[in-house]
Design a protein with these regions (language model features):
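C-terminal/domain-edge helix-coil "capping" segments
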Residues: 27-86, 172-261
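Short, solvent-exposed beta-strand/turn patches at coil↔beta or beta↔helix junctions
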Residues: 48-63, 302-336, 355-361
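An acidic helix/loop motif centered on a single conserved Asp/Glu
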Residues: 61-80, 84-125, 164, 199-200
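Periplasmic peptidoglycan-binding/anchoring modules of Gram-negative envelope and division proteins
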Residues: 64-84, 318-351, 376-380, 418-423
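A short, hydrophobic beta-strand-centered structural micro-motif
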Residues: 72, 76, 90-96, 121, ...
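Short, surface-exposed beta-strand segments enriched in small/polar/acidic residues
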Residues: 86-102, 307-317, 334-371, 389-402
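Periplasmic OmpA-like peptidoglycan-binding domain that tethers envelope proteins to the cell wall
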Residues: 102-115, 288, 321-327, 353-423
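Alpha-helical protein-protein interaction scaffolds
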Residues: 232-300
Length: 423
C-alpha cells in the first residue's frame, strides 16, 4: 500500500504529501508462427470461446459483505490430512486493509469483527484465534481481505462509486489459498475513516509486507500459492498488528515495545514499524528518539524510491495550519527530508496533487503552488538542493482514493510526489 499535498473541503484542512517514485516497465516480444499448409487446414469450425464471467452486481453494503463471506466459508477446501475427526480448524484474521493505501479503517475493522462472529456462530468447523505471534507460529488458517474503492467500470481510477470486497482464506501449512470471496458494495453506510494509527502516521511508502498481502488477496484463486512477500513477513506483521491495537487504545509504551520487538525480527524492517516507533515516541513526549525514528522513516522511503509525508495546509493556501498540535513536528520533518535527500545526490521532480472537488484549473494551480512551496522549504534546509529539484502540479487527475470526501479518508489524494529523475 504516498503522502500528499492537497486542497481541503468544509473541514478547512488540507493535506500535503511528499512521494518519491520510480517506475520500470518492460514488454514481451511476439514471434509469428509459420503458416499452416492449405491441405492440413481443418474443415470444422472451431468452438466459440467462452465469454468472461460478468462481475458480481453492486449490492447494499451489508448484503455485499454477507455475499463475499458466505462464498468464502462455504467453498473453502479445508485440508483433511493430519486432522482428527470432528476437529476444528484454528483461524486467525490478519486485519483487513484498503487495497490501494494499505490502511485500516472503521469499515475494515467492523468487517473483521463481523467475519469473526460469522465463523463463531454459523461455521463451527472454524476456531477463531487472536492474530498474535504465538498463534501464527502454529501455522493456522489465516483470513485476509481488501476493501477498495472502484469507479463505474470497476477500476481503481477517477471518482469511486463503489467498493470491491475481496476475501481470501489461506493455509499457512501448505502455503496455498483455500477459498476466495468477492463482492461489490454501494458506499452508503460505509465509514472509510482511517484508524488512529494510520490517521496519525506522518508518512506513507510502499511496503513489501503490505504489497504481498494485497497480491495474495487480489487477482488470485483457490489453490494459488500465498505471495512470498506476505508469507515471509506474516510473523512480524502479527507483532505489528498488536502494536497498532495498543496504539489505538492509547497504550503508547506498550505499542513502542511491540514495534521495537518487530524491528528486531528478520522480517521486521517494515514501513509500519518505523512509523509506529516514531508515533509512539512522539506520543510519549520523547522528542529526540522521535526525530531519530523519523529519519529512519525518510531513509526507508528513499531506499524504496517513494515517500509520502503529510502536511496540513490552510484551505486554498500554501501556508501550514496554524494549530501547533498539528504543525509542531513539521520543521523537524522538513529538516530530515532535506538532509537525507541532499546527501543522496538525487534529482527530483516534485508533483502536487489535489482532491477532485472544485474547478480543475484551480486544482492544478493549487497543486503546483504547494509543490513549489515544499520545494522552497526543502531548499532552505539543504544548500545545493535547489538546483536538483523541479516542481509540477497535476490537480486531481491521479487520485488514489477518489471518494471526494476531503477528510482523513482520502488524505493521500492531497499529495506531493517526489520522483527521482536524471540530473
Amino acid at each position: 500500500m504516498t503522502t500528499v499535498f492537497r486542497k481541503t473541503g468544509a473541514a478547512g484542512v488540507c493535506l500535503a504529501a511528499l512521494c518519491l517514485s520510480l517506475l520500470v516497465t518492460g514488454c514481451d516480444s511476439l514471434q509469428e508462427k509459420p503458416a499452416t499448409p492449405a491441405a492440413t487446414i481443418p474443415t470444422t469450425t472451431p468452438a466459440a470461446s467462452t465469454p468472461p464471467a460478468s462481475p458480481p452486481p453492486i449490492q447494499a453494503y451489508d448484503k455485499a459483505v454477507l455475499s463475499a463471506a458466505t462464498a468464502l466459508f462455504k467453498n473453502a477446501r479445508l485440508p483433511a490430512e493430519g486432522m482428527p475427526a470432528q476437529a476444528k480448524y484454528p483461524v486467525v484474521i490478519d486485519p483487513l486493509i484498503d487495497g490501494m493505501t494499505g490502511a485500516q479503517s472503521v469499515a475494515t475493522q467492523a468487517m473483521g469483527v463481523r467475519l469473526a462472529n460469522m465463523m463463531r456462530e454459523q461455521y463451527p468447523q472454524f476456531d477463531v484465534k487472536a492474530f498474535s505471534a504465538a498463534n501464527v507460529a502454529k501455522s493456522p488458517l489465516v483470513l485476509i481481505g481488501t476493501f477498495t474503492g472502484v469507479n463505474a467500470e470497476r477500476k481503481t481510477a477517477g471518482p469511486r462509486s463503489a467498493y470491491r470486497i475481496c476475501l481470501a482464506l489461506a493455509d499457512l501449512r501448505s502455503g496455498k489459498l483455500l477459498s476466495k470471496g468477492l463482492a461489490f458494495a454501494l458506499p452508503d453506510g460505509v465509514d472509510p475513516t482511517p484508524l488512529a494509527f494510520f490517521r496519525d502516521a506522518p508518512a506513507w511508502s510502499e511496503d513489501p509486507a503490505t504489497e504481498g498481502y494485497i497480491k495474495t488477496c487480489q487477482g488470485t484463486k483457490a489453490g494459488d500459492p500465498i505471495n512470498p512477500l506476505y508469507l515471509d513477513r506474516i510473523l512480524a506483521a502479527s507483532v505489528v498488528a498488536e502494536g497498532i491495537e495498543a496504539y489505538e487504545a492509547g497504550r503508547y509504551r506498550e505499542a513502542l515495545d511491540f514495534y521495537t520487538s518487530a524491528l528486531a525480527m528478520p522480517s521486521g524492517d517494515q514501513f509500519r514499524v518505523h512509523n509506529g516507533i516514531y508515533l509512539a515516541n512522539w506520543k510519549l513526549g520523547r522528542r529526540q528518539p522521535a526525530e531519530a525514528a523519523f529519519a529512519k522513516v525518510v531513509d526507508y522511503g528513499l531506499k524504496h524510491q517513494r515517500l509520502a509525508v503529510k502536511f496540513l495546509f490552510r484551505p486554498g493556501s500554501t501556508a501550514f495550519m496554524a494549530n501547533p498540535a498539528l504543525s509542531a513536528p513539521y520543521p523537524g520533518w522538513l529538516k530530515a527530508i532535506a538532509k537525507q535527500t541532499g546527501e543522496s545526490s538525487k534529482c527530483l521532480e516534485i508533483t502536487g496533487h489535489t482532491s477532485p472537488t472544485g474547478p480543475e484549473p484551480l486544482n492544478e494551480r493549487l497543486s503546483l503552488l504547494r509543490a513549489e512551496a515544499i520545494k522552497s522549504r526543502l531548499a532552505q534546509n539543504s544548500s545545493g538542493l535547489e538546483k536538483r529539484m523541479i516542481a509540477n502540479g497535476v490537480g486531481s487527475r491521479q487520485t488514489m482514493v477518489g471518494n471526494g470526501r476531503d477528510d482523513a479518508s482520502d488524505a493521500l489524494d492531497r499529495r506531493v510526489e517526489f520522483k527521482v529523475i536524471g540530473c
